């Protein structure tokens, strides 16, 4: 068995004295593991850093085997990603999100989105918006997609201001007004018009929105907690937009 694909390094684990087991997100074969011989060598360690884009060749006798990777560098961005807290936490948080999906399950659109986000993690506003959209895409692929295109009550496609916590569907400002205190806010940049830039308030609302549904549909049923890196990313992105912001008291303030 052999195949070749574009991939992004998610992480590595030591295996023996000189080798590692690499975890990558491939474009056409999803999240995949493989042994990299001499992966701890001076030549390979800089290549096998989270966030780097590589070309991998996977070989194994049978498809169900772990197999071996041969890895060639394409874009070595890991050093740059270590320069800001937003980038450091962002790489870790996206890896944790991808681990919610079955191994070897192809999600080419998530691979493409991951590459875009990795190139924008230096800009907190762009990174925050792209990260929220990435979380929405993961929710959708897990079968829990939100419907933000029209009002659940009236069918209206304008002035959408809320999201029902029960149905995950958008609600217009007028239809949702009587229950506004029980609704989740729909950030303008996620609306169907899509002509609003993300700012501190809208990103705060967006992180609450995706955090709520990830907790309800994924983390709670599986008996797991959200990755600490998600809270770190949220904190770093919002603090970059508002340097006067104090450290939030906990993940429930924004993340869920």
From Swiss-Prot:
The keyword DNA repair applies. Pfam families: RecO_C, RecO_N. Keywords: DNA damage, DNA recombination, DNA repair. One of its GO terms (cellular component) is bacterial nucleoid. The keyword Metal-binding does not apply. It comes from the Bacteria. GO terms for biological process: DNA recombination; double-strand break repair. Belongs to the RecO family. PANTHER family: DNA REPAIR PROTEIN RECO. Involved in DNA repair and RecF pathway recombination. NCBIfam families: reco (TIGR00613). This is DNA repair protein RecO. It comes from Rhizobium leguminosarum bv. trifolii (strain WSM2304).
